[in-house]
């Protein structure tokens, strides 16, 4: 199926910002003359003072680099003030609540007023340029207001996903030295309350330096209040002045810190700066999603993750877009929720995660067919590689074969999309992220660090910096160098494996730590998972390696079946043969364990570390499980593990 090619529809080639010829020209200029290219495209945002040098520094030595040196700007000014004259009364944010009966429309003028007032509230709490504020809010409009207010006065925000535990919150507050925490009484998810204020109180037992807690009354739930420390959001905003001049920021001043899990140790505080990040997110949002004035754009991510930072708030608002914020989940109140929202708000561009698509696919076509979706013109995926079967299901059923799919590859560290189709320029191959975005120079290297030419598989690295890239790990530049530049000095190591095909298209094969070495042969787990999911019985699978006496590592597959299939030994044998046929004998699974569900974080990522431990029977040392969406799933898997040892051998 990976051989399918979907050419660019003629209508897209004509109407899009970029056809193939334009892409090739722009890409060539962006890598041959990055200073000229980015100097030109940086004019898309407003600068208080122009830069003196577009790009300096390198990946060598101490790994320090700058973009738009000495340029002065303000992110909130670019997202709000400069849009007021032309589109003050245009809707900036459509907020769709967890309850399908609840939504709000917030214009640029209203958002600007709220942001200025809240920026003054932050100043009144003693916050100034360079200080850090921790934001622990659900997907409500106040989250957008809080981050833009921080940006307006030069306060560095650290947003903590509202699904994280008190321990995770405390660790992030302590690491960044946050003085103020902005939270809510409760969040809502699928009709169930999330005790955010209670979690905050628990976390603050370990954070003596937090001086103020600003609380949004979202559900009205009864929560603890600490007089003298807690500030009521609504009262404070009402009393604040709507006049707040934007702080003049240097292009290299920090904008935000966002924590991402490392393969070892505590989460890393990825630090993004102001000028390069905004230029990169705005340009990539316009070109990747072919965003035209009047389009309604919906990225389903949570703002607690980088996708929400870059492609719900900063990129879209810098482009004067109408962006949708969604508090809910795909299956509440039922499995048609996404598509009902699409119809309700006449969404044109829809960007979601493969894990959501696979969950929807498992429910069949009926919940999709129950809706119109005729407003959709473009679909996107983000967060992990999408297997060709899920891609085709999405293309055929959701987009009804009329909507191109932009399968985007990037990371918290990269700030924005690095490898992606452009809808008017790129012929699509299901499962491939296709080609690099402007200014991005990917390459594939083998484990010894030799650069591969032409088709080949290996580690994905990036040769040169780009404007949206992280500058350091907050408070730990050594860890930054160690993590990203020590394996192959002078090159940014992504930690992902990739394959480049004969057309120069990139296929992301999964994390390098998700590689299994079977009898000296390297296998990407994503490849085996794709083969399993291609079987009509399989809804989802996760594959890990486990210690094997003879082969070094064996293949252990967790398989979730579609609703109308029953597990049996016959089906297990059939799946083994299927994988052998799809990939070859080297990929034969040693064990297949039936899994009613897979352990996932609240952002939908499968926690493979836990699956590896269970496969290796190291169940008394599962490590940190606080980010699990459904802890009961793990208990089920452990219970089933013993049965697999005796009967699950494939």
From Swiss-Prot:
PROSITE patterns: AMP_BINDING. It catalyses: acetate + ATP + CoA = acetyl-CoA + AMP + diphosphate. GO terms for cellular component: cytosol. GO terms for molecular function: acetate-CoA ligase activity; AMP binding; ATP binding; metal ion binding. GO terms for biological process: acetyl-CoA biosynthetic process from acetate. Its cofactor is Mg(2+). ATP binds at residues 383-385, 407-412, 496, 511, 522. Gene3D superfamilies: 3.30.300.30, N-terminal domain of ligase-like. Mg(2+) binds at residues 533, 535, 538. Acetylated. Deacetylation by the SIR2-homolog deacetylase activates the enzyme. InterPro entries: Ac_CoA_lig, ACAS_N, AMP-bd_C, AMP-bd_C_sf, AMP-binding_CS, AMP-dep_synth/lig_dom, ANL_N_sf. The keyword Transmembrane does not apply. Keywords: Acetylation, ATP-binding, Ligase, Magnesium, Metal-binding, Nucleotide-binding. CoA binds at residues 189-192, 307, 331, 519, 580. The modification N6-acetyllysine is found at residue 605. Belongs to the ATP-dependent AMP-binding enzyme family. HAMAP family: Ac_CoA_synth. This is Acetyl-coenzyme A synthetase. It comes from Syntrophobacter fumaroxidans (strain DSM 10017 / MPOB).
């Amino acid at each position: 199926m990976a051989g399918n090619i979907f050419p660019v529809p003629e209508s897209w080639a004509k109407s899009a910002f970029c056809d193939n010829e334009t892409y090739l020209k722009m890409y060539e200029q962006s890598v041959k003359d990055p200073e000229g290219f980015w100097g030109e495209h940086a004019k898309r945002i407003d600068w208080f003072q122009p830069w003196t040098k577009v790009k300096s520094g390198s990946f060598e030595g101490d790994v320090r680099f700058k973009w738009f040196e000495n340029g002065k700007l303000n992110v909130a000014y670019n997202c709000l003030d400069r849009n007021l004259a032309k589109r003050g009364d245009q809707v900036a944010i459509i907020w769709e609540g967890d309850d399908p009966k609840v939504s709000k429309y917030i214009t640029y003028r209203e958002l600007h007023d709220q942001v200025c007032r809240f920026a003054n509230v932050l100043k009144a709490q003693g916050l100034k340029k360079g200080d850090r504020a921790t934001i622990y809010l659900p997907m409500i409009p106040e989250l957008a207001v809080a981050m833009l207010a921080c940006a307006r006065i030069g306060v560095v925000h650290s947003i903590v996903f509202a699904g994280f535990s008190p321990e995770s919150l405390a660790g992030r507050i302590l690491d960044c030295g946050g003085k103020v925490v902005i939270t809510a009484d409760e969040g809502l998810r699928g009709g169930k309350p999330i005790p955010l204020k209670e979690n905050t109180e628990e976390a603050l037992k370990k954070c003596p330096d937090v001086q103020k807690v600003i609380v949004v009354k979202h559900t009205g739930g009864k929560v603890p209040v600490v007089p003298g420390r807690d500030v009521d959001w609504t009262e404070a905003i009402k009393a604040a002045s709507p006049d707040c001049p934007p702080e003049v920021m240097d292009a290299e001043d920090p904008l935000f810190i966002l924590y991402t899990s490392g393969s070892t140790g505590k989460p890393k505080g990825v630090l993004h700066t102001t000028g390069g990040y905004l230029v990169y997110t705005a340009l990539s949002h316009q070109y990747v999603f072919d965003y035209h004035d009047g389009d309604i754009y919906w990225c389903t991510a949570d703002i607690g993750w980088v996708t929400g930072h870059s492609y719900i708030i900063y990129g879209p608002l810098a482009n004067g877009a109408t962006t949708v914020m969604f508090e809910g989940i795909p299956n509440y109140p039922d499995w048609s929720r996404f598509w009902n929202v699409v119809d309700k708000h006449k969404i044109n561009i829809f960007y979601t995660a493969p894990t959501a698509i696979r969950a929807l696919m498992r429910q069949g076509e009926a919940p999709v067919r129950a809706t119109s979706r005729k407003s959709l013109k473009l679909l996107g995926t983000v967060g992990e590689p999408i297997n060709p079967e899920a891609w085709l299901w999405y293309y055929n059923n959701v987009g009804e074969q009329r909507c191109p799919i932009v399968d985007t590859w990037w990371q918290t560290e990269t700030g924005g999309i690095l490898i992606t189709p452009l809808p008017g320029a790129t012929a699509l191959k299901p499962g491939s992220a296709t080609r690099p975005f402007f200014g991005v120079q990917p390459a594939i290297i083998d484990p010894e660090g030799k650069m591969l030419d032409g088709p080949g598989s290996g580690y994905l690295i990036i040769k040169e910096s780009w404007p949206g890239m992280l500058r350091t790990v907050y408070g730990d530049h050594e860890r930054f160098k160690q993590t990203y530049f020590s394996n192959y000095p002078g090159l940014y190591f992504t930690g992902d494996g990739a394959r480049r095909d004969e057309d120069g298209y990139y296929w992301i094969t999964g994390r390098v730590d998700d590689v299994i070495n079977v009898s000296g042969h390297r296998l990407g787990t994503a490849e085996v998972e794709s083969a399993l999911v291609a079987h009509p019985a399989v809804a989802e699978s996760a594959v890990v390696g486990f210690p094997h006496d003879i082969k070094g590592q064996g293949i252990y597959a967790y398989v979730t079946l579609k609703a109308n299939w029953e597990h049996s030994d016959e089906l297990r044998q059939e799946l083994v043969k299927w994988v052998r046929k799809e990939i070859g004998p080297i990929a034969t699974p040693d064990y297949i364990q039936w899994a009613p569900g897979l352990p996932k974080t609240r952002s939908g990522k499968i926690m493979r570390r836990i699956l590896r431990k269970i496969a290796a029977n190291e169940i008394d040392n599962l490590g940190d499980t606080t980010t699990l969406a459904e802890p009961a799933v793990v208990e089920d898997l452990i219970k089933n593990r013993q049965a697999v040892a005796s009967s699950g051998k494939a």
